[in-house]
């Protein structure tokens, strides 16, 4: 099976590294953080990134409003997976199992 990630995951990781870099107090810490961020970017070069396209947006907006407590980003990830008929791998089965038509499994625990 092919492995994919989503543009939403890329966004979350990028925001996380940006926040980490902004918190750095010393030049040494910044060098380390930038190097780790660069490694993360290189990792994305080896994997297909699924877009939040019009089909995913439609799927996202079709979810019941009761699911909003799961979180916008997680619901966007779920919408991308649903729109591609993809299996979502996550440890967060409690929330993702509530999403209609989403195939989700935890392969880690």
Protein language model features and the residues they cover:
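Flexible glycine/serine/alanine-rich "lid" or loop that lines and gates the nucleotide-sugar donor pocket
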Residues: 83
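Conserved acidic donor-binding loop of glycosyltransferase catalytic domains
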Residues: 91
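Flexible glycine-rich beta->alpha loop in the catalytic core of nucleotide-sugar glycosyltransferases
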Residues: 94
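PIN-domain endoribonuclease scaffold, especially VapC-family toxins
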Residues: 1-79, 87, 97, 103, ...
């Amino acid at each position: 099976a092919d492995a994919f990630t989503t543009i939403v995951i890329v966004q979350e990781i990028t925001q996380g590294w940006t926040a980490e870099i902004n918190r750095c107090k010393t030049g040494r810490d910044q060098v380390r953080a930038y190097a780790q961020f660069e490694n993360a970017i290189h990792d994305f070069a080896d994997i297909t990134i699924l877009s939040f396209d019009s089909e995913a947006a439609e799927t996202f907006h079709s979810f019941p409003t009761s699911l909003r407590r799961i979180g916008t980003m997680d619901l966007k990830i779920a919408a991308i997976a649903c729109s591609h008929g993809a299996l979502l791998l996550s440890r967060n089965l409690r929330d993702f199992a509530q999403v209609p038509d989403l195939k989700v499994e935890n392969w880690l625990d």
